[in-house]
Amino acid sequence: MGTVAGAPNSAGGGPGVAGANAVGGASTSAGSAGVTGLAGATGGSAAGGSSGSSGSSGSSSSGETTIVPDPSWTCGMADGIPAPSTGTLVFSVSLTVSATHNVGTTQFGKRRQLDVSGGTITGDKLKGTVLTGGLDYELTLSNGAMELEEVLVYKTSDNTSIFVRNCGVAAAGDQAIRIVPDIEAPTSGSYAWLNTTKLVGTRVATADKITLDIYDVSKAPASTNKTTLKDPAGVPNTSWDCVGGSGTKGDSVFTENVSLGSSFSVSNAKRGSRNIIPITGGTTTGKVAGKILDGGADYQLAGSSGTTLDARYTLAPSDGQFIIVRNCGPINSLVPAFEAAVDGPYKFLNDGKFLSSAPGSGSGGVSITFYERK
C-alpha cells in the first residue's frame, strides 16, 4: 500500500467466479498503496436486489444436486455449480479461525466475518500452508440462503505464493457451502493447472476451524437434478468486483492510519502479478473513531491495463461495532465500499456515496482519508 499502479483484479465473465477458476465481473484492483474493503460478495453492483423471493426451489437438500445460483452471485457458474461428489478430490484445506466478528444485519443481509490465522493444505499435487490474515465473509440472506467470499493466500511446500478467492452459495438449511475457487497461480511451473481446472468444493465452518475440500469436476456428468437459488426481492446485492463511481470530494468523513506488514508477490499469474501488502492494524479518527483490525491486505494487481489497488480489511470503532471495508481502483481514483449494521450509528456508510484519497505516508504504513462524494 505504499506505491501505486492500476489493473483489474477479476477478468472476464459475469459476477462471481468463472467456471475455469476465472472470476467474473468488473475489475477489482490492487495497487502499491491503497486500502480497500468489501462490498459483499456477489457479482452485481451493490444496487437493487434480484427478483426472486425464495431461498431455493427444487430438491429440499442440495448436497448431491447441481446448485443454480442467483444471477447476482453466480460464482462464474451461472448454469449451475456441480455437486463436488461428482468429481475427484484434489486437495483439502484446514483453516484456523482466530476470531469471529458479527457485523449484524447490513444492507445485504446478516453478515459475519471469520478471521483466518493460518492453515494447512494437503493433496497429491498441492501441499503447503495458508498464510495468516485470511478473511472469510459469510452472508445469510433473509430467506435463509447463504453467500460466501473468502480471500486467502497459499504458500506451497516449495515456497510458491498463490492467491485465492473462493465464491460460495448454499440453500437454506444446508450446512456445507458450495464453493468455486478462483485461483491465481504462476502460469508456468507445477501449479499452472490451478488457473484453468474446473474446481468446486465444500466449505464447512465450526467455532475455530474451517474445512475446504476441493474437487476437479472437469469430467463430471451433467445433472438434471437442480436446486435453484433466488435472492430476496428488493434487497441490494453485494458485488464481487470493485464498485465504481465518479464525482468530486466533499467534506471529510474519517481518516485512517494503516499499519502494514512486509509485502510479497504472486508473480506472472493469469491476471498479471500481485503485490500483496498485509494489513496489520491501525487507527481511525473522525466520524468513525477506533482501530483497524489485524487481517486482510492490499491485494494490488499489475496487469495489462495498469495497476489497481484492492484493500480488504475491517474497522472496529470504539463503540464495539464492526465495519467491513473494500477500497478499490487506480491509486488516484479509489472508491470505497462499506458494510455496516443498518441499526447502528454507521449505517450512513452503506449509501455508497464516498470517495477515497490516494494513500499517503503514515506512521508505520499509509494514511487515507474518506470524503463525501459530491
Predicted regions mapped to residue ranges:
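Ser/Thr-rich, Pro/Gly/Ala-heavy low-complexity intrinsically disordered linkers and tails
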Residues: M1-T66
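Beta-strand-enriched cores of mature, soluble protein domains
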Residues: I67-K374
